[in-house]
Amino acid sequence: MVSLGGFARKLFGSANDRRVRGYKGRVDAINALEAEMKALSDEALAAKTAEFRRELADGKTLDDILVPAFAVVREAALRVLGLRPFDVQLIGGMILHERAIAEMKTGEGKTLVATLPVYLNALAGKGVHVVTVNDYLAQRDAGMMGRIYGFLGMTTGVIVHGLSDEQRRDAYACDVTYATNNELGFDYLRDNMKYERGQMVQRGHFFAIVDEVDSILVDEARTPLIISGPLDDRSDLYNTINEFIPLLSPEDYEIDEKQRSANFSEEGTEKLENMLREAGLLKGESLYDIENVAIVHHVNNALKAHKLFTRDKDYIVRNGEIVIIDEFTGRMMPGRRYSEGQHQALEAKEKVQIQPENQTLASITFQNYFRMYDKLAGMTGTAATEAEEFGNIYGLEVLEVPTNLPIKRIDEDDEVYRTVGEKFKAIIDEIKSAHERGQPMLVGTTSIEKSELLADMLKKSGFSKFQVLNARYHEQEAYIVAQAGVPGAVTIATNMAGRGTDIQLGGNPDMRIQQELADVEPGPEREAREKAIREEVQKLKEKALAAGGLYVLATERHESRRIDNQLRGRSGRQGDPGRSKFYLSLQDDLMRIFGSDRMDGMLQKLGLKEGEAIVHPWINKALERAQKKVEARNFDIRKNLLKYDDVLNDQRKVIFEQRIELMDAESVTDTVTDMRNEVIEEIVAKRIPERAYAEKWDAEGLKADVQQYFNLDLPIAEWVAEEGIAEDDIRERITAAVDKAAAERAERFGPEIMQYVERSVVLQTLDHLWREHIVNLDHLRSVIGFRGYAQRDPLQEYKSEAFELFQALLGNLRQAVTAQLMRVELVREAPEEPQPLPPMQAHHIDPLTGEDDFAQAGETLLAVAPANRDPADPSTWGKVARNEACPCGSGKKYKHCHGIYEA
């Protein structure tokens, strides 16, 4: 029976259908210009770019020139690449231009679609960023699509790992820049650690089109980009605590797989306290005393490492290092590390070398990075299931773009078995059957462990004609994917999200030519062999089509419907036939976590025998409900985390904007003077209470404050003892003395050096305090949840206390800058041997090295006389030579102590 809503949709079409139909008028207008564009010479077509820019300068908007601009790009794509965007691709381009997400199925040409809005928006001259998930795709797409932009007189840049700042600056200066989300985010963070505007590489955030937008803005949303520097070595502590966990019994802890949490029971806590006490690590009586906060953190990490993290599923051990596996894509993520000591706990568990923990120097989430853009859009094959999240968090509407040809793929109902063993036996039989009939097959698994288990089982059954595609062998993945459509091919793959390479029936001729003819010089022989390869691939395609097209067989459901849909979407590209099917068991993770007990009892009552499966649409619906629950929970987590992160983000924006203002200003003398005057106001107000008699004034305290902040020995007690002296008189005398001392120092330095000194001190002090502030907010965030037990809203408490911490940061900044500038002196230092900078690490990428901000040998350096340095306050140290003893009194050289934090 058709519901009333279903009947209305049939009659009028869905809201999505109506929106898509609304683009038809402009599509017709673009098509009407096709003959006119074809008649233009290459030079005349390229000259359209300058013409459009003149029109924009004369007051037209991008919307006004959309139709002719799209027509120009379509013709250029045909001439340069031999590809003519279909009408549905024009619609996709318009959706992207209008700040929305275009959901386009696999094989529908998203890469080509992006060229339409990219060209249009690049005409504004502010730069357009096209965001991909890895360096390979960024280079591939920039190389291919850059030919279109180049033909039309535009420049194309690409940002990949390993480029110098100068190369990055040049790439960002181009009309169009292709880059990964990681590189963009880290360049932004690094830019806001620079000390001169000219050193920055990015030029703003105008328009970004994010490819695989669901992967970047949903799956990666919870992971912050972090640039960090090393802390002291604590490997002994990690190893000691790691030895305790295997000594515990199952009743000593509680594991919640749904929430990914692990906690000690009362019995476990008692055992742990005894072990810690024997090891001399426990302070006081209880593990949960305030002085044991750090130890609690370490033991919790060790428990999670042993009970929540699984080798070959969550991470692998390669070359003596723990390498994280992306749960959504199955890719290795070298260089990326779990934060807050969790990675070190895993290293202790696996008995590999423990790398030092890091202090966060700068961080931002993808959510907040991409929300900085004036205009944001995205493309993916699967976004509809996350439409609410895109709307709520990013203000992005999701529109499904119709396929150019109808989808012929058949999505079959799931087969559910009672045990994993029965399921895999059925899968092996199905793989052999598909191979015998010549049907190419993609077998999807949820982890490396599962893919290798299946591979071993296939070998034991006597079948070895398969390829394995997972994070262990990602170097070969492009070639394996390219040939996965050959008749009879069997490809076992971890989650295929973000692979970026289509599976073409018959194989990919271009990839084969690249591989097989790499050493063949251009000429008649190469042309003949290329032709032969293309003809062979065409015959293989016809054979694969006759066998039913690509067969996607999934061995398990993922907790996200979107990942399942991505796997299904590998089959049936561009109107090809295909089929997809999920083989499940009640022992699968999703089934086990979300109530398979009732289903198991029901299947037993139905008399299901060993090796038999149940196939029913009801099973699919029940699983979909379970997946929706997980998705809703994950969305709530991300939404809640964003509320907390927004607090830090608002403060980050203030600090970063302030840094840029300081770098852009001709002089920061007025800012420094204001800071100095505010410090005077603060110390006078603190030591001379309002309306208090002179006898109540704290003359000694005020004298000490003046000495601490202004490096002056003033006769405060004598002033206070004067007859009829007022608070304003004291303030004015201090101000006059301080201004005089500051003016004398400025005269000694000269205006040019003084401006450099002031700017350097303000920026370096701001950075130092900001890093400390980030750590303080992290600590606050880790404990704020307990306020809920006192019937207080943790988020409101966090906002309130974070604001107080920020106010304290600004107060500390005024005091530290003032104290340092009143002590700084010019000295000459002997030339020093070049020293390598300490490593900083950026999660997601390999360790980076910052630019050398130290002065070159023989230049004038700024230093504070040792007698004027406060060991407890780094802001009073000024410039410290790297081989000098650290002013903190540790006895170490500065470069091995506090100097390691200098970026």
From Swiss-Prot:
SUPFAM superfamilies documented for this protein: Helical scaffold and wing domains of SecA, P-loop containing nucleoside triphosphate hydrolases, Pre-protein crosslinking domain of SecA
Cofactor: Zn(2+)
Cofactor note text: May bind 1 zinc ion per subunit.
Reactions accelerated catalytically: ATP + H2O + cellular proteinSide 1 = ADP + phosphate + cellular proteinSide 2
EC numbers: 7.4.2.8
Major site of localization recorded for this protein: membrane
PROSITE patterns, sorted: SECA, SECA_MOTOR_DEAD
Subcellular localization: Cell inner membrane; Cytoplasm
Main enzyme class: translocase
Protein known as: Protein translocase subunit SecA
Gene (name only): secA
